[in-house]
Curated annotation (Swiss-Prot):
The keyword Protease does not apply. Pfam families: UPF0114 (PF03350). The keyword Cell membrane applies. NCBIfam families: HI0507. The chain crosses the membrane at residues 15-35, 53-73, 136-156. This is UPF0114 protein PST_0950. It is found in: Cell membrane. Belongs to the UPF0114 family. GO terms for cellular component: plasma membrane.
Length: 162
């Protein structure tokens, strides 16, 4: 009975596979929005203000960071919790493939969240006259919470490995 239960629990990890595959659709949706933003800005490129252009570029950078985060979680999560990816060495194999454990994935996700939060905060500062000071204060507090959390996770990871 114990053996059957353990085998069933181990096999249950495959329930994560469609979830990780679903992240590929999320990446596709993000790519569509990215190019929608590009096609939206191109006709206005010569008449748009510098500040609006910078805000648009920050949005594009934000989407690129989220896309990288999706790929990292999708591939590393699959490899860590479902099965190893069998990618031929001759193909464009990602350097970190097979080397990122759940701890390093957690740190990379935290760093990505801090970077994404930084871009959102920068966008807020670009339009600071239009934003309520209390709302801006909460954005800063939330961002600092992300920064402190990422730092704490990195520190905890460092002291537990030594």
């Amino acid at each position: 009975m114990e053996r059957i239960l353990e085998n069933a629990m181990y096999a249950a990890r495959w329930l994560l596979a469609p979830i990780y595959f679903g992240l590929a659709f999320a990446l596709l949706a993000l790519a569509i929005k990215f190019f929608q933003e590009i096609f939206h800005i191109l006709p206005m490129i010569l008449s748009i203000s510098e500040a609006d252009l910078v805000l648009t570029l920050l949005s594009l950078i934000d989407m690129a960071l989220v896309g990288g985060l999706l790929v990292m979680v999708m591939i590393s999560g699959y490899e860590n919790f479902v099965s190893q990816l069998d990618v031929d060495e001759g193909k464009e194999k990602l350097d970190w493939l097979g080397k990122m454990d759940s701890s390093s994935l957690k740190l990379k996700v935290a760093a990505s969240i801090v970077a994404i939060s930084s871009i959102h905060l920068l966008r807020m500062f670009m339009d600071v006259q239009q934003i309520d000071s209390e709302k801006l204060m909460w954005y800063v507090i939330i961002h600092l919470t992300f920064v402190v959390s990422a730092f704490a996770m990195g520190y905890m990871d460092k002291i537990t490995k030594h």
